């Protein structure tokens, strides 16, 4: 029960609920920058001709009651103007007189909670471009070289390596006519998505299906000696997604998980240090420990 959770010294949640722990600020607090990003005369929707200044190089938080204009300011005015000026996007921003300071940035990255994909074929590994590295790694295994397997052999979207009965889905749809369709595990591959020959190729004792069933944290241990793979896995862990399975279907992820996947993808890319990150309610639904991880990035 709640009282036991709060009093338990071994419970992370209890530590936060009791006040023994909390989301910490960075011990080395950054000094405000001389440069600022300034929105002039924002007047769209509920905004009433306001000027807003954001210090460059710091974490800025926009908060307020529902309907106060937070989303209008950040998403409709700032994000759309930045997308237009930095990326030539054809977006019409909300009414305002101008934005000063965008010259301090060379790109704008907007990270929201919209789904990363409706298809069950999309997963964390494919979204952050990790699956490409894994397929290449499996194609370099000794058995793959003997058999002439290419990275495409380890894609469940292509004929050759996938199970042809379920077409790489791992599930088979049963038409129930007047009832909703039912999906059952493929009898041929037992849900593994690949054919027997492909699953005979192993990396450190694991085949490709077993790797996709691993959590991100477990995979980090397996690929310790492969820097390019490990870097992506560690970035996923840094945003608090170490518990997700590499092959977990995208349509089973929450909005917060989708948002952190997007953030991980952006952080794993080469950056110039001049990116403007716009996060829409990044802590919604997160445990305090995950909020701390987000703050520590």
Predicted regions mapped to residue ranges:
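Conserved phosphate-binding elements of NTP-dependent enzyme cores
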Residues: 1-297
